[in-house]
Amino acid sequence: MNGILNINKPPGLTSFGVVSKVRHIYSQKKVGHGGMLDPSATGVIPVFLGSATRLIEYLSSVRKTYLAEIELGTETDSYDSEGEITSRKSCEHITADMVRNALPDFLGEITQIPPMYSAVKHRGVRLYNLARQGIEVERNPRKAAIYGIEFLGFASPVLRLRIECGHGTYIRSIAFDLGRKLGCGAYLKTLVRESYGPFHLTTSLDLADLEAAENKGRLADILLPPEAAVGHLPRITLDDESITRLVNGLEIRLEMTGQPEAMAVYSAENRFAAVIRPETDGSWHPAKVFLSPCPKKNAD
């Protein structure tokens, strides 16, 4: 089967654990996920099956939205509730206005130091593997894009934020850095991913929904089409001749203003055909093809 599942990951399960369960339920080897979540986090994780896995890379540019609960007054070595407590300070003097006034510093393009408990590599070794050995190393700062932070409430010591961000953002690092800015320390208490590009929590499936569909023989019915992953790309409808060239691996030329990094191609019958990318000579090359070439007719 080919398609996408918008899964609501439960707490305590790794992202690869979700993939493993989907692989087992669908009896399919080619399964991958579009964005890792920490085991303690919950929420949206898109899972790709079959040929749809070829589109995972196009999700790297989409925005994500998180609901975060941050507890002030305590720091942990993992920056979240899973780690060992490393510091405690009073936060009784912290007010909601103080939190609001600190938030603008975290908007726009910021730099973050990845937590030691992260998948970032140091000299070929995952940081979390070093952290589990009690080894802490200097980490290079990384850029992150924060598009919005909504203050949802503060009942000391816990504050609630909704954060819209780009690829590679560590919400745990935002919690840690915010605590440092407020002078009391903080850690990420809970995290829910509410959206991942076109995939939203309100339309997600629990793993129990997959099991129910399996029992009813309706696993194919709950799959989203592969093109659901590229809905954010510019869309273009092409004639049969152009699509035939693309599905046969040939470039095409287009009369258009502007040049996006990629476009989703559809046929006149609204069939998803390919993703194309521009070349330096002005042509467009098929990066991913989803229609099969028409068989050649035998000569009379």
UniProtKB/Swiss-Prot annotation:
Keywords tagged on the record: Isomerase, tRNA processing
SUPFAM superfamilies the record matches: Pseudouridine synthase
Catalytic site positions: D38 (nucleophile)
Record-linked InterPro entries: PsdUridine_synth_cat_dom_sf, PsdUridine_synth_N, tRNA_psdUridine_synth_TruB, TruB_C
Pfam entry (one): TruB_N
EC annotation from Swiss-Prot or TrEMBL: 5.4.99.25
GO molecular function, one term: RNA binding
Catalysed reactions listed for this entry: uridine(55) in tRNA = pseudouridine(55) in tRNA
Gene Ontology biological-process entries: mRNA pseudouridine synthesis; tRNA pseudouridine synthesis
Keyword Isomerase attributed: yes
Family (UniProt): Belongs to the pseudouridine synthase TruB family. Type 1 subfamily.
Function of the protein: Responsible for synthesis of pseudouridine from uracil-55 in the psi GC loop of transfer RNAs.
NCBIfam families membership: TruB
Protein name, as recorded: tRNA pseudouridine synthase B
Organism expressing this protein natively: Dehalococcoides mccartyi (strain ATCC BAA-2266 / KCTC 15142 / 195) (Dehalococcoides ethenogenes (strain 195))
Gene designation per UniProt: truB
